[in-house]
Curated annotation (Swiss-Prot):
UniProt record similarity statement: Belongs to the complex I subunit 4L family.
Annotated signal peptide: none
EC number: 7.1.1.-
Function field: NDH-1 shuttles electrons from NADH, via FMN and iron-sulfur (Fe-S) centers, to quinones in the respiratory chain. The immediate electron acceptor for the enzyme in this species is believed to be ubiquinone. Couples the redox reaction to proton translocation (for every two electrons transferred, four hydrogen ions are translocated across the cytoplasmic membrane), and thus conserves the redox energy in a proton gradient.
Organism: Rhizobium etli (strain CIAT 652)
Alphabetical keyword list: Cell inner membrane, Cell membrane, Membrane, NAD, Quinone, Translocase, Transmembrane, Transmembrane helix, Transport, Ubiquinone
Protein name: NADH-quinone oxidoreductase subunit K 1
GO cellular component terms, A-Z: NADH dehydrogenase complex; plasma membrane
Length: 102
């Protein structure tokens, strides 16, 4: 059995849908929202690498590596902000984020 472009796009669509559902169904926990955003970015990367492979163009793979780097930095900064927020407020609920106003 040959794994074609449609298989990669199906996996990517499933990951993207899970990420969107994770954002919209769980509005309480910031960590789950961050993980859902990472799932969405991963699905975009799978699309880029799959199209890059099947079109014999390396630009998509290079851009996917760039997106992975930015996503790792985004996750590190987001988790650092969550740690500081938890130390100050004692919770990481999304409802408490509006209390961060000056």
């Amino acid at each position: 059995m040959v794994i074609g472009l449609s298989h990669y796009l199906t996996v990517s669509a499933i990951l993207f849908t899970l990420g969107v559902f994770g954002i919209f169904l769980n509005r309480k926990n910031v960590i789950v929202i961050l993980m859902s955003v990472e799932l969405i970015l991963l699905s975009v990367n799978i699309n880029m690498v799959a199209f890059s492979h099947f079109l014999n163009d390396i630009v998509g793979q290079v851009f996917a590596l760039f997106i992975l780097t930015v996503a790792a930095a985004e996750a590190a900064i987001g988790l650092a902000i969550l740690v500081v927020f938890y130390r100050n407020r004692g919770s990481i609920a999304v409802e408490d984020v509006n209390m961060m106003k000056g």
